[in-house]
Regions:
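Hydrophobic alpha-helical transmembrane segments
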Residues: 1-115, 124-335, 339-444
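Short, acidic/turn-prone active-site loops that include or flank metal/cofactor-
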Residues: 118
Length: 444
């Protein structure tokens, strides 16, 4: 008989094998993960493992989560062969954080999360506590095997930050398996933290200190005005304030101005043709007022890039990512909203079939043109502000187009099945735009 408690205990106990990452080479560890995948697929169902296989998986004929777990571990090892401490920490968050959240949520979860009633505050806190502790331990345990050894601040701070980020991602109401989203998020945060250097911080400390005061004042005023003007909800006000402070403190008024332009683009285009959108049932919720999830999905990566520009030695790449993320997000919003308001025929990029406006992933000629022009305008403003050289504008626009294509394809295929939601798609969109823009700049 299936037992969720037994499943989670096994899920958590598998983290003991992460201890081996201190003594194994990356290829030895990869072989072990591959062997675990074969074991879970072939041996486990025949060796009494049905007690930890959910009924839905049993009826399907294969245990999805139990197979994805070793695949995620294998990918972590392959992604960070020289930094197995990152793989071990992310593994600890996957095993202990995710497992503790389920057990605590089932046992003590009484306070539901506002954005996902299926998750609880107690479960989230258990995730962060257990996952953070496990990640710090594994980072410390594997540190002697890393050359050069990571700094103590990284061993302590980065895993905790990764646990918080992964815990929040785990609460997003989507069908994407936690065994994918949790380790991917944790590993991304740990990798970004590994790029931070004391030298970069020291070189920008004076400018950051000078920007903090104005950042607090300007963003408090802007966030309050946005809420009073009913352009954002309370969650959007708070998230926008935090993102704005990070961007202003890191990049000054030039970076913040570009962020504000992106927000203005989203606000204005959301209100264009609002009556028509409402009649068709495709208007943004609450009259286009942006929430916290929308704010982070569209501009969160830009805030991360802004911080990376002053905390890592990769300032140029970070600035390209910053401008590209905003241009991609702003252009995508313009494409979506103008397409729904004034677009003609709309088509799915995956099948070329004509569909009604507002269908996930659907594109129109008018919307696509508006998106490209919006991305071009934001990229050009980024160049005028001195954030990127003018010749990089085309790379940013190309990245924005690539992001839009990827988002449309994923929206048409994965969003209807709730594997991802609109906020996740928007974040993927901005990430794709930033990555493609950086790649183009590097090979140009």
């Amino acid at each position: 008989m299936f037992s969720e408690t037994a499943r989670q205990i096994v899920h958590m106990s598998m983290s003991v094998f992460a201890l081996l990452l201190r003594v194994l080479t990356w290829w030895q560890a990869a072989l072990c993960a591959a062997a675990a995948l074969v074991f879970n697929a072939v041996v486990l169902p025949r060796a009494g493992g049905r007690a930890i296989i959910r009924p839905a998986d049993a009826s399907r004929g294969y245990p999805v989560g139990i197979l994805i777990y070793p695949v995620s571990v294998l990918l972590l090892i392959l992604a960070f062969p020289e930094r197995l401490d990152i793989a071990a920490s992310a593994w600890g968050i996957l095993a202990l954080g995710d497992g503790a959240a389920t057990l605590a949520g089932r046992r003590w979860g009484r306070h539901r999360l506002a954005w996902n009633p299926d998750k609880s505050v107690e479960g989230l806190l258990a995730f962060i506590t257990a996952g953070g502790a496990a990640a710090v331990f594994f980072a410390w345990w594997t540190a002697p095997a890393i050359t050069p050894p990571p700094a103590t601040t990284f061993i302590i701070a980065a895993p905790i930050l990764a646990a918080v980020a992964a815990g929040l991602v785990e609460t997003i109401p989507i069908a994407l398996d936690d065994n994918i989203s949790v380790p991917a998020t944790a590993a991304a945060v740990l990798w970004l933290c590994s790029l931070v250097t004391a030298g970069a911080w020291a070189g920008n400390a004076e400018a950051i200190a000078a920007n903090v005061g104005p950042a607090l004042v300007v963003n408090t005023a802007a966030a309050t005005a946005g809420w009073l003007l009913r352009t954002v909800r309370v969650s959007g006000m708070l998230a926008g304030w935090a993102i704005g402070v990070v961007v202003f403190a890191s990049l000054g008024v030039q970076g913040w101005g570009l962020l504000f332009l992106t927000f203005l683009t989203a606000t204005v285009t959301s209100r264009l043709g609002l009556k028509k959108k409402a009649l068709l049932g495709i208007a943004e919720e609450r009259g286009g007022r942006r929430g916290g999830g929308n704010a982070f999905a569209n501009t969160g990566l830009a805030a991360i890039a802004a911080a990376a520009a002053v905390a890592t030695p990769f300032r140029e790449a970070a600035l390209v990512a910053f401008v590209a993320a905003l241009a991609t997000g702003g252009g995508d919003t313009a494409a979506s909203e103008i397409g729904k308001a004034w677009g003609g025929k709309t088509y799915l990029p995956t099948t070329a079939a004509e569909v009604r406006p507002g269908t996930p992933g659907a594109v129109s000629l008018e919307g696509s043109a508006a998106g490209i022009l919006g991305a071009l305008a934001i990229a050009a403003c980024g160049a005028l502000a001195g954030l990127i050289p003018p010749w990089m504008v085309w790379a940013v626009v190309a990245g924005a187009i690539a992001g839009s294509i990827v988002e449309s394809a994923l929206a048409a295929t994965l969003e209807p099945a709730r594997v991802v939601n609109n906020d996740v798609l928007n974040f993927i969109n901005t990430a794709t735009g930033a990555i493609v823009a950086i790649a183009i700049v590097r090979i140009s």
